[in-house]
């Protein structure tokens, strides 16, 4: 399974992308 830091970084990227729309 992915590490917690990887999941957190991916989630942050998704939130930033959505917020930028």
From Swiss-Prot:
It comes from the Eukaryota. Keywords: Allergen. The keyword Calcium does not apply. This is Pollen allergen Ole e 7. It comes from Olea europaea.
